Amino acid sequence: MGYWKSKVVPRMKKLFEKSPAKKEVVEEEKPREVEVVEEVVVKTEEPAKEGETKPEEIIATGEKEIEIVEEKKEEAKPVEVPVLAAAEEKKPAVEEEKKTAPVEEKKPAVEEEKKPAVEEKKPVEEEKKEVVAAVPVAETPSTKAPETPVVETPAKAPETPAAAPQKA
């Protein structure tokens, strides 16, 4: 207890003596922060007033945009004729696709040649799997389990010598 009173208690008192001084300094800084916060609030209120006028402008522009969209819809009706012209332009593209189709037919022929080679490899892998599977089965303890009952049969062997003296 002497160590506690002489070393620990005085250090704790020093810690608490320093903290009130720091708290006073922090308290002085808080009013400054509040002023800054108030300024920020005032600044945010002013743009809000400006923002209120902006939505009215946006609404007005929105009506103009609606009118423009309606005008574009009217213009879209005569545009249907160029769409038919675009369909005619697509027909030559279909012919070009037919020309490229024979090239695609050649590629599958090459792929077909590769497939038999892959098929030949697969049976080899299956044979390996079968061989590997057969080896562990022979070594498993389950095959040794039937041998254990065979060991128990010699326990019956003493009974047979007892039967042998009866014959003699």
Curated annotation (Swiss-Prot):
Cofactor section: Cu(2+)
Positions of region (Disordered): 88-168
Its membrane topology: Lipid-anchor
Keyword Transport: no
GO process annotations (BP): cell morphogenesis; cortical microtubule organization; leaf senescence; negative regulation of microtubule polymerization; regulation of cell shape; response to abscisic acid; response to arsenic-containing substance; response to cold
Protein family per UniProt: Belongs to the DREPP family.
Main location: membrane
Keywords: Calcium, Calmodulin-binding, Cell membrane, Cell shape, Coiled coil, Copper, Cytoplasm, Cytoskeleton, Lipid-binding, Lipoprotein, Membrane, Microtubule, Myristate, Repeat
Coiled-coil parts of chain: 56-77
A cellular-component GO term for this protein: microtubule
Function noted in UniProt: May be involved in intracellular signaling through interaction with PtdInsPs and calmodulin (CaM); may keep PtdInsPs attached to the plasma membrane until Ca(2+)-CaM reaches a competitive concentration subsequent to an increase triggered by a stimulus, thus leading to PtdInsPs release and subsequent activation of InsPs-dependent signaling cascade. Binds to microtubules and inhibits tubulin polymerization. Regulates directional cell growth and cortical microtubule organization by destabilizing microtubules (e.g. in cotyledon pavement cells).
InterPro entries (alphabetical): DREPP (IPR008469)
GO molecular function: 1-phosphatidylinositol binding; calmodulin binding; microtubule binding; phosphatidylinositol phosphate binding; signaling receptor activity
Induction note: By arsenate As (V). Accumulates in response to abscisic acid (ABA), gibberellic acid (GA), cold, and drought stresses. Induced by various salt treatments such as NaCl, KCl, MgCl(2), MnCl(2) and ZnCl(2). Expressed during leaf senescence.
Sequence repeat spans: 26-30, 69-73, 94-99, 103-107, 110-115, 118-122, 124-129
Tissues where the protein occurs: Mostly expressed in the expanding cells, specifically in roots (except in root tips) and flowers (at protein level). Also detected in cotyledons, hypocotyls and trichome stalks.
S-S bonds: none
Name the record gives this protein: Plasma membrane-associated cation-binding protein 2
Region named 7 X 5 AA approximate repeats of V-E-E-K-K: 26-129
Superkingdom, natural source: Eukaryota
Lipidation (N-myristoyl glycine): G2
Quaternary structure and interacting proteins, as annotated: Binds microtubules. Interacts with calcium ion Ca(2+), calmodulin and some phosphatidylinositol phosphates (PtdInsPs) such as phosphatidylinositol 3,5-bisphosphate [PtdIns(3,5)P(2)], PtdIns(4,5)P(2) and PtdIns(3,4,5)P(3).
Bias-annotated ranges (Basic and acidic residues): 88-131
